[in-house]
Amino acid sequence: MADTYVGAIDQGTTGTRFMVFDHGGHVVANSYERHEQIYPKPGWVEHDPTEIWENTEQVVTDALDSGGIDASQLEAIGITNQRETTLIWDAESGRPVHNALVWQDRRTTDRVEELEEAGKADAIRAKTGLQPDAYFAATKAEWLLDNAEPLKLAGSRASDLRDRARDGELLVGTVDSWLIYNLTGNHVTDVTNASRTMLYDIHEMAWDDELLEEFDVPEAMLPEVRPSSDEEFYGHTDPDGFLGAEVPVAGALGDQQAALFGQTCFDEGDAKNTYGTGSFYLMNTGEEAVESDHGLLTTVGFQMSGEPVQYALEGSIFVTGAAIEWLEDVDLITNAAQTAELARSVDSTDGVYMVPAFTGLGAPHWDGRARGTIVGMTRGTRKEHIVRATLESIAYQTRDIAEAMEADSGAETTTLRVDGGAVKNDFLCQLQADILQTEIARPEVDETTALGSAYAAGLAVGYWDTIDELRDNWQIDREFDPEMSDAEADRMYGRWDDAVERSLDWATEE
């Protein structure tokens, strides 16, 4: 196996990466390309699907070239993707009918409030495990069918979008489906991505007729739902296409479930938190779909071929790494690495709290109209205090989730496995250990999202035989133990709720 590998396409919110892994789970080739963030109106966020696909072709080609690897040496390709981001495309031409609506997009908040006012939220939550929110795909698909620009569909009229969809001439999907379609020609998604649409019954493991009717999304346009690691494969790449080889596409997971898989959280009670644009804290709950009483989501964790679905509890935090990007945008820092130095330069925030609710608040608050807030400033407040408060906000939001997770599951997390770009920041990792009063374990391979999708694909084709091999690959880079007292952590966390309260229900005019 020394000369064969597994590739992973990691299509994220800000860019697309292709990583090639060897049997030991080590990265042997890597390429990354950013794509444009499109903001047509306040609260609206879009991506160009064509740009995403072109970037995917580019990073796959560049990574293989840089690693001196021929595409024929890839035993399989796995896919992981920004979840909930939704697009519709023409089945014959492959042309998107509109930009993709990104998971952060809030344009359907009014529609979600209609559902809540009509008393439908509990029924939706019971079937899907999801708190109705503009975050998920259902209202995005509905909006696209109502509003997609008809001029992008040659010869069609605005009124016939749903007719064409019912006839299977239009396809809808999350980004994994878009990539699988372009790679293989097949319309497929996996169970984890399906579970994020708000159209899928996670108990029956099927598209739900009542939800499809509620959002008027024809079933004919939906992808086939398959296991996350699929021994029957989703399809093969075209040997006459850009890769020049026929490679099985055999695994897919939404990015947060991929990180759960990559962190080898295969057992009930295992938990991880990924710090990316947002942060997503998942705990494996085994074969039981645990219902949350504390604002968490019940979701599909993963499924391997021929095996039962593994469920998870999830706390979705919409803005963490994006708050660091905001500090750059407003010139408080010049790069993300600078945050640790600035935060260490002051002993505290001097009472400043920052709530980074730029796109509303996710778990456990679920307020789509919350907005970013800084409170507690005085004339003596400096940028160092605001930078430190921003890092602390990441730790506080994570504690919100950890407390809800323990309340719902009845299990206390003794070690939290962390990954994502922000965990390279030792100050943040130590701060997180202190605020949670929990050990933080950072793995050697921190690109666990890509690694998880590679593992799923590799298991499907027999590159790895068992999940025990994957457990053996997982190695700790560093552990962070709490250095702060319980009392001090509680004191700092104590005013966080007050700050959050001031951010709620702000964007009343949107």
Locate each region found by the language model:
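Active-site core segments that coordinate phosphate-bearing ligands/cofactors
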Residues: V6-I9, T109, L115-T128, Y135-T189, ...
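Short linear loop/turn motifs
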Residues: L222-E232, A340-S345
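Short beta-strand-loop/turn "lid" adjacent to the catalytic site in phosphate-handling enzymes
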Residues: D65-W103, T128-A137, I180-D201, R226, ...
